[in-house]
């Protein structure tokens, strides 16, 4: 089988939701909420965890250990999410 055919076969098998171009971490959850969010709640570790499900009814989503801003995760704690006209959401971090 030629290499191109193998690559195309692999891309068809692996859903694109496994890959996150925004730099966040894709995490598996369930229909009641996100598994990573519940894990972080144990022991008071959920202070800054924010999660969102990619599509309604999906068990896949993205979780940030910092602030979630639009489709991205901010690089550090203490950042705020701002909206720039024509550029979309972005993180504004102190210092």
Curated annotation (Swiss-Prot):
Signal peptide: 1-24
Secreted in keyword set: yes
Function recorded in the entry: Alpha-conotoxins act on postsynaptic membranes, they bind to the nicotinic acetylcholine receptors (nAChR) and thus inhibit them. Through its two C-terminal domains, this homodimeric protein would bind to two nAChR allosteric sites, located outside the nAChR C-loop of the principal binding face and at the adjacent binding interface in a clockwise direction. This toxin specifically blocks mammalian neuronal nAChR of the alpha-7/CHRNA7, alpha-3-beta-2/CHRNA3-CHRNB2 and alpha-4-beta-2/CHRNA4-CHRNB2 subtypes.
Primary location group: secreted
Residues making up the propeptide: 25-45
The record's note on its domains: The cysteine framework is XX (C-CC-C-CC-C-C-C-C). Displays a mini-granulin fold, a structure composed of two short, stacked beta-hairpins connected by two parallel disulfide bonds. This newly described fold is derived from the same cysteine connectivity as knottins (ICK fold). The name 'mini-granulin fold' comes from the structural homology with the N-terminal region of the human granulin.
SS bonds (residue pairs): 64-73, 69-81, 74-91, 79-93
Residues modified to 4-carboxyglutamate: 50
GO cellular component, one term: host cell postsynaptic membrane
Positions where 4-hydroxyproline occurs in the chain: 56
Protein name according to UniProt: Alpha-conotoxin-like Ms20.5
Record note on quaternary structure: Hetero-, homo- or pseudo-homodimer (identical sequence, different post-translational modifications). Heterodimer of [carboxy'Glu-49', hydroxy'Pro-55']Ms20.3 and [carboxyGlu-50, hydroxyPro-56]Ms20.5 may exist.
Family: Belongs to the conotoxin D superfamily.
Superkingdom assignment: Eukaryota
Keywords: Acetylcholine receptor inhibiting toxin, Disulfide bond, Gamma-carboxyglutamic acid, Hydroxylation, Ion channel impairing toxin, Neurotoxin, Postsynaptic neurotoxin, Secreted, Signal, Toxin
Tissue localization of expression: Expressed by the venom duct.
Any one Gene Ontology molecular-function term assigned to this protein's record: acetylcholine receptor inhibitor activity
Subcellular location: Secreted
């Amino acid at each position: 089988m030629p290499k191109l055919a193998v690559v195309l076969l692999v891309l068809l098998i692996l859903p694109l939701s496994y890959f996150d171009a925004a730099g966040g971490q894709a995490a598996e959850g369930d229909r009641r909420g996100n598994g990573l969010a519940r894990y972080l709640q144990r022991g008071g570790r959920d202070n800054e965890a924010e999660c969102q499900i990619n599509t309604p009814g999906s068990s896949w989503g993205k979780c940030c250990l910092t602030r979630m801003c639009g489709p991205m995760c901010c690089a550090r704690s203490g950042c705020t999410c701002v909206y720039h006209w024509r550029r979309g959401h972005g993180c504004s971090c102190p210092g």
